[in-house]
């Protein structure tokens, strides 16, 4: 053994070939600060070996290196800029030493090589991969850019266009694509990976392969003519401006850095990467996006822990076909859980099957599946008008009309047709689970399961624990949602649960703005372009359905009369009374026509202004900041109340529910991350300016207390140790 660290070791393999093996404690390898330091120490030992002829890098895990240790990021990002820059210089000196070894080097890559893992293998001369490879640089999705030489080496290896596509979009690619673009040199089966790697190294050692020529382009300026460079970078910047926008600075910074570094060799190019990385790491956007990644891991880990002793349902059923029922049935079948779809008429069943078939055909058109796979999936969805087969169902989700009487009747009838241990769930969006459970003989086997539309796209499923829901019931439904590829978050029962409970105060803030003379078009523009929502409130209401919102608004007002009961006729009432129900009938705040792809396209409609004039004061031009404050304060206050009341268990789960269920702008990180970034005292000062608008604007006592003590909702993070101690960690 030449060297042994905590996460890697170095040993002779055969005949002058050494192997450097990543083998961290636990199930995966991460390129954390300690591993980078250990890699440097291993290379120091290796550089003294006069008999060295070649080096093989490999992993003892199912994945090569899954990336940097993102749990370290928040503390690293608090390190002063100069120290962070020094740490990056040190880390890059390690990878440069790997790249500069006087012998051929090869990385045998299995499974994932992402982020720092990808940057590590870019420093070797050759890369051999297994068919399960996923390799790429996802850093821009975390609000940063590659910092270990990825933005320098990848363009010089692949050419500007392919590299820009991966780096700016934060993409990873599979083995076949990686081979095609030159990111790996060969793909072999797992069982022959090491044998193949040694064979390639031998060819390089004997001179049959020119490893020096392979290495040289990574050390030089990017080979692009002025015209080629102008085309590549202009197109890339245009694409990034269109897709990422101003709220996500990392992709544009990465493109501009690669452009600026194109005329330099490795050392100066790495300096430019360093100078770009450090300011990005100190942005609120990076902290928010890293926070989302960590929250996502926390939420998924919690679901995994909850279901560790539970068998995933093998047979499911959906009550109520149509768009929603068909979407749920498709998602379950697509992920391998057969589903019975029951309705009371053929028309609805046909609609549900058509929806499932449409979604599968889209997968076929995109080349994701073949006809055989399509037929196999669709054959596991069984439409029926009766309860045949319900005696072997493990879990049933009811997705009928949002009417408590109808839902109770359907659930009570179904309970008599299933096994005693079968779990029943309701896909209600607002009706309290306790109310629906009152119709059942075994309420302990019942809970809420709130999917979001469109089911195949929206990652969140709210799992609602009723007062009598058993732990086993919740675990079974969480297991099914996880199997469907969704992110389940368990909340406690109340009107609207979590997501709709916090959404309707936001809509109430919108209604009050319109009442006070705001133009809905400007409100939409500000909330989309300035705050960053994917849709403004008017557009969102049209998509949700004005009739749906009108009904839900009444349910929420009954549930929380003190805050959500309004004493005036609002814009939603006016549109509802005029039968303007939004996209579903082509008229809402906007008028809708189908575009060439059959999707609804919004257009101005002057008639809506006359309609809204009856429920509004004369036009008043509100500032952008006023609009944002009046829209967001009611939502933030309600989110805080939900945490204080135990409706949602943690700030992390609340923020993920908002991001995954409502599209809360990821660069803000969620309501609690946004609050912590603003500072609770600053938020309180802002909110108090609007408390005259009513109870929705009154800040909860718990938040007032946080402001008094200047406390954040997330645990405070300490800066990482000084860079000097990081080197020898």
Swiss-Prot record:
Catalysis: reaction(s): a (3S)-3-hydroxyacyl-CoA + NAD(+) = a 3-oxoacyl-CoA + NADH + H(+); a (3S)-3-hydroxyacyl-CoA = a (2E)-enoyl-CoA + H2O; a 4-saturated-(3S)-3-hydroxyacyl-CoA = a (3E)-enoyl-CoA + H2O; (3S)-3-hydroxybutanoyl-CoA = (3R)-3-hydroxybutanoyl-CoA
An example Gene Ontology molecular-function term: delta(3)-delta(2)-enoyl-CoA isomerase activity
EC number, UniProt record: 4.2.1.17, 5.1.2.3, 5.3.3.8, 1.1.1.35
Ranges where the record places region 3-hydroxyacyl-CoA dehydrogenase: 311-729
Binding site for NAD(+): 324, 343, 400-402, 407, 429, 453
Region (Enoyl-CoA hydratase/isomerase): 1-189
GO biological process: fatty acid beta-oxidation
A GO cellular-component term linked to this record: fatty acid beta-oxidation multienzyme complex
Amino acids binding substrate: 296, 500, 660
Keyword Lyase in annotation: yes
Pathway the protein takes part in: Lipid metabolism; fatty acid beta-oxidation
InterPro entries the UniProt entry points to: 3-OHacyl-CoA_DH_CS (IPR006180), 3-OHacyl-CoA_DH_NAD-bd (IPR006176), 3HC_DH_C (IPR006108), 6-PGluconate_DH-like_C_sf (IPR008927), ClpP/crotonase-like_dom_sf (IPR029045), Enoyl-CoA_hyd/isom_CS (IPR018376), Enoyl-CoA_hydra/iso (IPR001753), FA_oxidation_alpha_subunit (IPR050136)
Gene3D superfamilies in alphabetical order: 1.10.1040.50, 2-enoyl-CoA Hydratase, Chain A, domain 1, NAD(P)-binding Rossmann-like Domain
Active-site residues annotated for this sequence: 450 (for 3-hydroxyacyl-coa dehydrogenase activity)
Region (Disordered), start-end ranges: 708-729
Annotated Pfam families: 3HCDH, 3HCDH_N, ECH_1
Protein function: Involved in the aerobic and anaerobic degradation of long-chain fatty acids via beta-oxidation cycle. Catalyzes the formation of 3-oxoacyl-CoA from enoyl-CoA via L-3-hydroxyacyl-CoA. It can also use D-3-hydroxyacyl-CoA and cis-3-enoyl-CoA as substrate.
Database matches in HAMAP family: FadB (MF_01621)
Protein name: Fatty acid oxidation complex subunit alpha
Organism: Salmonella newport (strain SL254)
Gene: fadB
């Amino acid at each position: 053994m030449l060297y042994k660290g905590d996460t890697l070791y170095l040993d002779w393999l055969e005949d002058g070939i050494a192997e450097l093996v990543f083998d961290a404690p636990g199930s995966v390898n991460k390129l954390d600060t300690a591993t980078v330091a250990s890699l440097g120490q291993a290379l120091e030992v290796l550089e003294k070996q006069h008999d060295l002829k070649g080096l093989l890098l490999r992993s003892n895990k199912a994945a090569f290196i899954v990336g940097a240790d993102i749990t370290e990021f928040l503390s690293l990002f608090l390190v002063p800029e100069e120290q962070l820059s020094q740490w990056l210089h040190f880390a890059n000196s390690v990878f440069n030493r790997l790249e500069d070894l006087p012998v051929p080097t090869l990385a045998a890559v299995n499974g994932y090589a992402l982020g720092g893992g990808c940057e590590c293998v870019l420093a070797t001369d050759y890369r051999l991969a297994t068919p399960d490879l996923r390799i790429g640089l996802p850093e821009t999705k975390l609000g940063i850019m590659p910092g270990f030489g990825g933005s320098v080496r990848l363009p010089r290896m692949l050419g500007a266009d392919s590299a820009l596509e991966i780096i700016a979009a934060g993409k990873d690619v599979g083995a076949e694509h990686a081979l095609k673009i030159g990111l790996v040199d060969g793909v072999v089966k797992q069982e022959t990976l090491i044998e193949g790697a040694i064979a390639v190294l031998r060819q390089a050692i004997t001179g049959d392969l020119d490893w020096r020529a392979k290495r040289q382009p990574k050390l030089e300026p990017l080979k692009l003519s002025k015209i080629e460079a102008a085309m590549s970078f202009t197109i890339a910047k245009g694409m990034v401006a269109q897709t990422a926008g101003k709220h996500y600075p990392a992709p544009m910074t990465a493109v501009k850095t690669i452009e600026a570094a194109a005329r330099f060799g490795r050392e100066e190019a790495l300096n430019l990467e360093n100078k770009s990385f450090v300011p990005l790491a100190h942005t609120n956007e990076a902290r928010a996006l890293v926070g989302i990644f960590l929250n996502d891991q926390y939420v998924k880990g919690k679901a995994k822990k909850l279901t560790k002793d539970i068998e995933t349902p093998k047979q499911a059923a959906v009550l109520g076909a149509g768009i929603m029922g068909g979407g749920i049935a498709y998602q379950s079948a697509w992920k391998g859980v057969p589903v019975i779809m029951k309705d009371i008429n053929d028309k609805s069943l046909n609609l549900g099957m058509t929806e499932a078939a449409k979604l599968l055909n889209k997968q076929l058109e995109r080349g994701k599946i073949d006809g055989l796979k399509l037929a196999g999936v669709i054959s596991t969805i069984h439409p029926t008008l009766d309860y045949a087969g319900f005696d072997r169902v493990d879990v049933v989700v009811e997705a009928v009309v949002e009417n408590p009487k109808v839902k109770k009747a359907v659930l009570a009838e179904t309970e008599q047709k299933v096994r005693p241990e079968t779990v029943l769930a309701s896909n209600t969006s607002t009706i309290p689970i306790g109310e629906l459970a009152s119709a059942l003989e075994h309420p302990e086997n019942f809970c809420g399961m709130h999917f979001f539309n469109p089911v195949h796209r929206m990652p969140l499923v709210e799992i609602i624990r009723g007062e009598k829901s058993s732990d086993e019931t919740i675990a079974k439904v969480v297991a099914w949602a996880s199997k469907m590829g969704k992110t389940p978050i368990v909340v406690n029962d109340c009107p609207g649960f979590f997501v709709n409970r916090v959404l309707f105060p936001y809509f109430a803030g919108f209604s009050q703005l319109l009442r006070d003379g705001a133009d809905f078009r400007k409100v939409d523009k500000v909330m989309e372009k300035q705050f960053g929502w994917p849709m403004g409130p008017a557009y969102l209401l049209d998509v949700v359905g004005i009739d749906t919102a009108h009904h839900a608004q009444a349910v929420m007002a009954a549930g929380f009369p003190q805050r959500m009961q309004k004493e005036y006729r609002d814009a939603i009432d006016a549109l509802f009374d005029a039968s303007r129900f939004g996209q579903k009938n082509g008229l809402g705040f906007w008028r809708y026509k189908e575009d060439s792809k059959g999707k609804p396209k919004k257009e101005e409609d002057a008639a809506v202004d006359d309609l809204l004039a009856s429920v509004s004061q004369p036009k008043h031009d509100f500032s952008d900041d006023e609009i944002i404050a009046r829209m967001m304060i009611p939502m933030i206050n309600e989110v805080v109340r939900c945490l204080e009341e135990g409706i949602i268990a943690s700030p992390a789960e609340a923020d993920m529910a908002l991001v995954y269920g409502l599209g809360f702008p990821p660069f803000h990180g969620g309501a609690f991350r946004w609050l912590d970034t603003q500072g609770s005292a600053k938020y309180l000062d802002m909110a108090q300016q609007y408390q005259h608008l009513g109870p929705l604007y009154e800040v909860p006592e718990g938040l007032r207390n946080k402001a008094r003590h200047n406390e954040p909702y997330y645990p405070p993070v300490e800066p990482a140790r000084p860079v000097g101690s990081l080197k020898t960690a």
